[in-house]
Amino acid sequence: MKKLTKFLTSASIGLSLSAVIFLIKDYIYDSAMKEQDIFTILIAIFVPLFAIGTLLSVLLSKKIDRQKLLTFGLLFSGIFIILLTYLNIYHLQMLMPLMKTNSITLAVMWIARIMGGLTGLFIGISFGATVKNGVIHYILLVLFATGIFALGRFMPALISYEPILYTAGGLSLACALLNSYIETEKTKNE
């Protein structure tokens, strides 16, 4: 069970990281925001906060158990990826039909900035906690990220971005629950 959870955790972080970095660009571009260069802003916020999250994970791992950090990071990165995917222009127009399109576009831009930054922070925390688990998990993480990147670049017409982003968020949430369960069982047995 532990090996499966570690494998799924590595897959989840790799999928989340690559989905946000590589797939969100085309997803936002397809969401009627062609005139806005939101991806550059999202990545400009995502990357530094990812680095801060990784640094926080390293610093906090001395005071807080790595398993708790991993669960915390996975839980919130999953929530923010799902929210980032759901709150696009089309969904916001359905939720608020009386708002002007310009206002909705502006709202989506702010949502993408905030959610991109928060997602980067929590994926960074998860990444820092996972890399300490061993070289195999780091290699798996990189392989999943590379695989999603290849899918996004070489077969863009065949892939719908929304299911991949929802899968990344859902897998992060599932791994957070599995890691939480393992942590609870470990404390019960002690």
Can you describe what each PLM-predicted range is?
Residues L75-T101:
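C-terminal ends and interior cores of transmembrane alpha-helices
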Residues I41-F50, L141-F144, L171:
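Transmembrane alpha-helical segments of major facilitator superfamily
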Residues G152-G170:
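A membrane-interface helix-boundary motif in multi-pass transporters
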Residues L95-G124:
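Hydrophobic core of transmembrane alpha-helices in multi-pass small-molecule transporters
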Residues V47-L55, L121, A145-F149:
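Residue-level signature of mid-helix packing/kink "hotspots" within the transmembrane helices
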Residues G53-R66, P156:
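Helix-to-loop junctions at the C-terminal end of transmembrane segments
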Residues G170-E190:
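Multi-pass alpha-helical transporter architecture, strongest
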